[in-house]
Amino acid sequence: MELAGGTDARIVVIPTAASQDHFPEDWSGLAPLIQAGAEDIQILHTRDRRKADTEAFAAPLAEATGVWIPGGRQWRLVDAYLDTRVHQALFELLERDGVVGGTSAGASILASYLVRGDPETNQVMVSPEYQVGFGLLSKTAVDQHLLARGREDDLWEVLDANPDLLGIGLDEGTALVVRQDHAEVIGVSQALFYDATEPPRYARSFASGAIYDLGTRTPVATAADEDASEEDRDGIQLGTRP
């Protein structure tokens, strides 16, 4: 809400990852945004990608200052919106300094590589037919519910086959605020970053307040780091791979 303009924010919610086909104006999924002060919210939803590729359907995004994508199954978002006018409008929103955010499936879809895209189960990391996300975060794969569901090692399967990708794992109650290449961790738990480009491969965990450079794949020193130990500054190394 703050990034989208506070009480002046114009929010478009895209709930298509969920299983239901209809989302009324009083849909309960809007409650967190309303509680955060949102006064101008529109729901944008379709299962028809031809409709999603029309200017008329995507028009609310042209006026939006923020987009929020709730959870569900990410393959539904691919089927409805990948390479459509809606997808293009998300990039245009960022170009005019708007914000696009999401939770669970709505977080994973923002990456260039799509994890857990299999329509049958969310336990499969790599689905042959669903490997492409929206790409707002280039050269990345984003997993979620990481520590809460014991998924700390799951991203290695993706990175073993695609070592150029940066793996990002988000625990519940935790998010990244990304500006250009800098990703700031906020929330109550951890964000993990996985790098398989050079041995030894590693995953590093960072708590709220840490900033990670997605381009150089290194932590960014902050004022709070001056009194921290070297281990705290560099993050906690997890799951090093040979």
Role assignments for model-derived ranges:
Residues 54-66, 75-96, 208-227, 231-238, ...:
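Mature, structured domains of secreted/extracytosolic soluble proteins
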Residues 12, 18-63, 69, 76:
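Portal/gating segments that form or line small-molecule/metal binding sites
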Residues 70, 76-149:
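Class I SAM-dependent methyltransferase SAM-binding "motif I" and its flanking Rossmann-like core
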Residues 1-7, 17-27, 32-35, 115-242:
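C-terminal and late-domain segments of enzyme folds
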Residues 37-40, 96, 163:
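A short helix-to-beta-strand connector/capping loop
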